Amino acid sequence: MKEAQSMFEIPRGALYPVPPLRDIVVFPHMIVPLFVGREKSVRALEDVMKDDKQILLVTQKNAAQDDPTPADIYSVGTVGTVLQLLKLPDGTVKVLVEGGQRASITKFAENEDFFQAHADLVEEKVGESQELEALGRAVVSQFEQYIKLNKKIPPEVLVSINQIEEPGKLADTVASHLALKIPEKQQLLECATVSERLERVYAFMEGEIGVLQVEKRIRNRVKRQMEKTQREYYLNEQLKAIQKELGETEDGRDESAELEEKINKTRFSKEARDKALAELKKLRSMSPMSAEATVVRNYLDWMLSIPWKKRTKVKKDLKLAQKILDADHYGLEKVKERILEYLRVQNRMNKVKGPIQSLVGPPGVGKTSLGKSIAKSTGRNFVRMSLGGVRDEAEVRGHRRTYIGSMPGKVIQGMKKAKSSNPLFLLDEIDKLGADWRGDPSSALLEVLDPEQNGTFNDHYLEVDYDLSDVMFVCTANTMRMPQPLLDRMEIIRVAGYTEDEKVEISKRHLIEKQVEANGLKKGEFAISDDALRDLIRYYTREAGVRSLEREIANLCRKAVKEILMKGSAGAKVSVTRRNLDKYAGVRRFHFGEAELEDLVGVTTGLAWTEVGGELLSIEAVSLPGKGRVTTTGKLGDVMKESVQAAESYVKSRATAFGIKPTLFEKRDIHVHVPEGATPKDGPSAGVAMITSIVSVLTGIAVRKDVAMTGEITLRGRVLPIGGLKEKLLAALRGGLKHVLIPKDNEKDLAEIPDNVKRGLEIIPVSTVDDVLKHALVREVEPIEWKEPEAVEPAVAKPQTDGGGEVLRH
């Protein structure tokens, strides 16, 4: 011990470089590697290596501090020697140090590059030799027990501990191997008395051994529990093997027998029966509590809950069918006639095979309720599958059984809900199908909607063919924007909007009665006159269907309930008339009557088709000084912009016939605007209206306020046919217009237009632009004669001569 002390004999108050340590306390006689990364600590090590100095290894109080102050460093550390130093590529330094003797810092030196401190070596107080001997033996014995419980310490450490004779070194070496917190290790380092240090080490080990023994008991208990579980599993497997030899248990036998009985009673196809029996056989060989058994049981439940060849009796009374359709829906005569034709053919052929009916029309015209009426009139069970926003193919075809929580697709789920194999299956909003990386559900529907293929529809979950050939499929859509192969499998039945008379009749027959009941009104408490009903339709709704109208009637009913309750008198009732309609319905939302109040130059009323029915389209044109440019505004699409260009070119080509001087185009700009500016517009059918506005603004002849028009134009002045004629004519009638110009080629479509619409409008077929202008302008255009001005040849100066030669003058 004296020799060890003489090695570190340095004058008291010597100056040492100090690298603050984090998460480690270095004890005397301890060799430990350190990784130094902070700049101050690296510079301290460089200073040590210059003169082969000693280093003071002191721990900082808070390891989280990157830039500690002297106050953040413990005052007692260990003077050590640097045995090895290695600079790493990332700038950090790996250093191997050996602890020497305890030292107490007296004062930190002023050094900005790194910490330096004056420190005095701490002399150990040895104490009585016999007591130290006893404490040493007790510590070694306790350490042996500690090593047995703490597997992290290698057994070789015990050999080196047994060879230590010095009590102080023994205490420090054992302390360095204990799993203690930094403050506890620092207490041991600061303890100068050897006997006290040994006692503290012994006490720390005593506490740690107690904790380790509890940990060991917990580990043993968990191990025993696991062994017990494994043993139970092994015995269960043996029990299953014995049960397989002797026969199933009562519960298992009852479940299997019940499933087998259901399978035998169900009218499966041969493939489905074989599959169900194979799954039942698999279920019998499984543990009832296993996860796989639950999957098989769910599969069999689905197989047994789907209707297999379980038909309901289809009604063939077509008179009853017509009566039901007429009772549920007013108007829609062409649609109902087409449905009845389809039903007649099905009854005659006694099978469903044929085109899939698809009802296409704006919202609120009764497409979904028509599907319900068809089911009611044929006696089929009704099931509806909403396809709006469906993006995953598995929604239609189902998920494979390998996935957790898998189940059949919506088609098979719908068949389970229908409880018969020949329901009416309504595929609602089929045009709203989406597609993404999970697949295209519209492609999955191709098999469902093909009469030649749907007899063997294969759901991914069932994995067997299911016959959908007896199902009557009806689709609904707002537009025909759907994949062509899907569209090819359908027969489109157009459901156009309702006329004003039809809306009045629908309100009287269905909507008023429904809302009176829904709002708790009694019979005789609420009444609305026909004139008030017409005003409600004209000034408060602007739609093809009747949804907004129903909301307005519901609003009137609520106001009536409030008024009756406020009066509080028995027999109070509310009558809505044209005079008091504003009181209950509020301010008028729409204008009804002519699109324009007077004949205006450059303002033409066009007709547009939208998903919610027809709309009036006001097309405005103005002429202003410029260089012959044409500007378009109103959020027009490419096709509509091209219509403006075609109209401009045609007007330029026939300028004199329209009474327009050709030179006018070089001096004037034309601005065409289609309000409302925020609404996107596209399509070629506004071509005739564009030409009319441009001719009107260049000639100064006003356009008739009571004329609306629709049609595509060509550069030769022909008017081409358009689509959505019924919706456009209904919009003109709603707008109070008297005359409508339509393409001559659309004259054949007038057969499908209701008589009251044809009576309310003067429909004028036109085939050329001249016909359009003749009816649209307040007076006819007057042609003018125009001669192109003769081109003036540039004068060429004669060359001047000077004497006999020619001279060029510059």
From Swiss-Prot:
Organism of derivation: Azospirillum brasilense
Record note on quaternary structure: Homohexamer. Organized in a ring with a central cavity.
Inducing or repressing factors: By heat shock.
Chain's role: ATP-dependent serine protease that mediates the selective degradation of mutant and abnormal proteins as well as certain short-lived regulatory proteins. Required for cellular homeostasis and for survival from DNA damage and developmental changes induced by stress. Degrades polypeptides processively to yield small peptide fragments that are 5 to 10 amino acids long. Binds to DNA in a double-stranded, site-specific manner. Involved in iron uptake.
UniProt xrefs under Pfam families: AAA (PF00004), Lon_C (PF05362), Lon_lid (PF22667), LON_substr_bdg (PF02190)
Chief localisation class: cytoplasm
Record has Protease as a keyword: yes
Positions of the catalytic residues: 685, 728
CDD domains attached to this UniProt entry: RecA-like_Lon
GO molecular function, one term: sequence-specific DNA binding
Protein name (database record): Lon protease
